Amino acid sequence: NPEVTEKTGISSFQLIEMVVKKLKPSMIIMVDSLATNKKEYLNNCIEINNTGIIPGSAIKDNKKIDKNTFGIPVIAIGVPLVLKIDKDMYTTPNVGEIIEMTSSIISDALNDLFF
């Protein structure tokens, strides 16, 4: 997320790296927005995988967060919130509402899974 680096001077990867070194968790659950070039995916699905994620890959940040990098399982959850067409990126006017709704769905699912 470019805002993380912009506001803190630290990339998402660096923040996660510091937390993992300090707290030594048994798993990373990474949630991030995704860019898509298919309009039918925009605000319309949730991607879940165990192969990791590259936060900021749409803006050419390419440090992968995965089991090989950190030595612990990584569950990556991505939501396509940005439509990428050529070099331009677009969001819908109601992206804030979509984030609120989607974050509720994801957090409820994680709470049901772990608690």
Regions found by a protein language model. Give the residues of each.
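Short, flexible loop segments at boundaries between secondary-structure elements
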Residues: 58-81
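Short glycine-rich substrate-engagement loop in P-loop NTPases that contacts/grips substrate
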Residues: 9-13
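Glycine-rich phosphate-binding loop
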Residues: 14-63
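Active-site histidine-anchored catalytic micro-motif
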Residues: 6
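C-terminal functional extensions of proteins
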Residues: 77-115
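Short helix-loop-beta-strand segments that form the rim/entrance of peptidase-like active sites
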Residues: 1-3
